[in-house]
UniProtKB/Swiss-Prot annotation:
InterPro entries attached to this UniProt entry: Aldolase_TIM (IPR013785), FMN-dep_DH (IPR000262), IPdP_isomerase (IPR011179)
Organism: Staphylococcus aureus (strain MRSA252)
Family of this protein: Belongs to the IPP isomerase type 2 family.
Protein known as: Isopentenyl-diphosphate delta-isomerase
One of the record's GO molecular function terms: NADPH binding
EC number: 5.3.3.2
Subcellular location: Cytoplasm
C-alpha cells in the first residue's frame, strides 16, 4: 500500500466515523443506580482524581485514540491537544504506524505533544509491531503510556487488513516486558472477555481498555470501504462496554481497567466507574465537537461534562471513584442473564 493510499484510508476512517450515530439502545440504559434522597456531601467535596499504580489523571475522562497519519488528521490532533491542554484531560493518538513507516508523517502525531508539552499523552501501536517500533512510538511522543490496539474484526473486514494473528499474544508480552511506561491493551469497539483477561494477566499486562461495542463501529467503517459492502451482518459483533466491565470484575484488583465504547453522557461515565473502571475514554464525541463546533466550544463541553459528573456523584453520596464501586445497582434481566450464563461473580457493597 502506498503512502497516499494510507493517508486516504485515515481520512476515510474519520469521515465515516463522524457520520455514524450513537446506538439507539445501550446497555448503559440496562443498569440503574438506587437513589437516596439526602446526600451527606457537597459538590465541592467531590474528588475526581483517577489513581492507578503508574498513572494519575486529574479527571477520569480521556480523549481516546482516534487518528493521525494525514494532513487533515494532523489538524484534528492539533485541536484535540489544545482541548486536552486547556481542560487537563489525558489524550491518546491513533495508530502511529504511519509515522513509524514514514518520518514525513511523524508531525501528524507529534503535533499533540507540541501543543500540549506538559500533558498526559498515550501513544498507540498495533499488536503486531516489533518491540523496537513500540519503543520508537513511545519516544516519538514522549508518551506517558502506550496503547496496543487489538482489532481482529476490523482487520478481517478491512479489504487490505491483516489475516495473521497467531503471534499477537507473544508479541504483546515482549512489548510489555521491554517498554518502560504503562502498556494498555486496547480493544477498538468489540469488548473484552474474562478469558482474554486471564491470558493478558498471565503475560504481565497491568492495564486494559475494554472498548465495548456501541460507539465507533469499525466493522461498519471497513465494510463501507469494501467494494460490495457485504459484511454488514457483523455490525453488532462483540460485547458491550457494560458486559465487558462485568467480565473484568475478577481481575480488577490486579489489572487497571479503563472503559470506552459507546459512552454518551456523564451518567454513562459514572456507571462505568461504578463497574470498576479507573477512567473512561471517548473518541467520536470529542471528534464531532471539535470539528463541528471548534476548540472553545469543545472545552466548554468538557467542563460541563466534568461538572455533571460531580453532580451525579453528589446524588450518589460518592466522594471519589472508589466510593462509586460500593453503590447499589439494579441490572435489567438481560444483563443478569449475561452475568449468570457467563458465571461472573459480581459482589457489590
Amino acid at each position: 500500500m502506498s503512502d497516499f493510499q494510507r493517508e486516504q484510508r485515515k481520512n476515510e476512517h474519520v469521515e465515516i466515523a463522524m457520520a455514524q450515530s450513537d446506538a439507539m439502545h445501550s446497555d448503559f440504559d440496562k443498569m440503574r443506580f438506587v437513589h437516596h434522597s439526602i446526600p451527606s456531601i457537597n459538590v465541592n467535596d467531590i474528588d475526581l482524581t483517577s489513581q492507578t499504580p503508574d498513572l494519575t489523571m486529574t479527571y477520569p475522562v480521556y480523549i481516546n485514540a482516534m487518528t493521525g497519519g494525514s494532513e487533515w488528521t494532523k489538524n484534528i490532533n492539533e485541536k484535540l491537544a489544545v482541548v486536552a491542554r486547556e481542560t487537563g484531560l489525558a489524550m491518546a493518538v491513533g495508530s502511529t504506524h504511519a509515522a513509524l513507516r514514514n518520518p514525513r508523517m511523524a508531525e501528524t502525531f507529534t503535533i499533540a505533544r507540541k501543543m500540549n508539552p506538559e500533558g498526559m499523552i498515550f501513544s498507540n501501536v498495533g499488536a503486531d509491531v516489533p518491540v523496537e517500533k513500540a519503543l520508537e512510538a513511545v519516544e516519538l511522543l514522549e508518551a506517558q503510556a502506550l496503547q496496543i490496539h487489538v482489532n481482529s474484526p476490523q482487520e478481517l473486514v478491512m479489504p487490505e487488513g491483516n489475516r495473521e494473528f497467531v503471534t499477537w499474544l507473544d508479541n504483546i508480552a515482549s512489548i510489555v516486558s521491554r517498554v518502560s511506561v504503562p502498556v494498555i491493551i486496547k480493544e477498538v469497539g468489540f469488548g473484552m472477555s474474562k478469558e482474554l483477561m486471564h491470558d493478558l494477566q498471565q503475560i504481565g499486562v497491568k492495564y486494559v481498555d475494554v472498548s465495548g461495542k456501541g460507539g465507533t463501529n469499525f466493522v461498519d467503517i471497513e465494510n463501507e470501504r469494501r467494494a460490495n459492502k457485504d459484511m454488514d451482518y457483523l455490525s453488532s459483533w462483540g460485547q458491550s462496554t457494560v458486559e465487558s466491565l462485568l467480565e473484568t470484575t475478577a481481575y480488577q484488583s490486579e489489572i487497571s481497567v479503563f472503559a470506552s465504547g459507546g459512552l454518551r453522557t456523564p451518567l454513562d461515565a459514572i456507571k462505568s466507574l461504578a463497574l470498576g473502571a479507573k477512567a473512561t475514554g471517548m473518541s467520536r464525541p470529542f471528534l464531532n465537537q471539535v470539528e463541528n463546533n471548534g476548540i472553545a466550544h469543545t472545552v466548554a463541553y468538557v467542563e460541563s461534562f466534568i461538572e455533571h459528573m460531580k453532580s451525579i456523584m453528589t446524588m450518589l453520596d460518592a466522594k471519589n471513584i472508589d466510593d462509586l464501586t460500593q453503590k447499589q445497582i439494579v441490572f435489567s434481566p438481560e444483563i443478569l442473564s449475561w452475568i449468570e450464563q457467563r458465571s461472573l461473580n459480581i459482589h457489590r457493597g
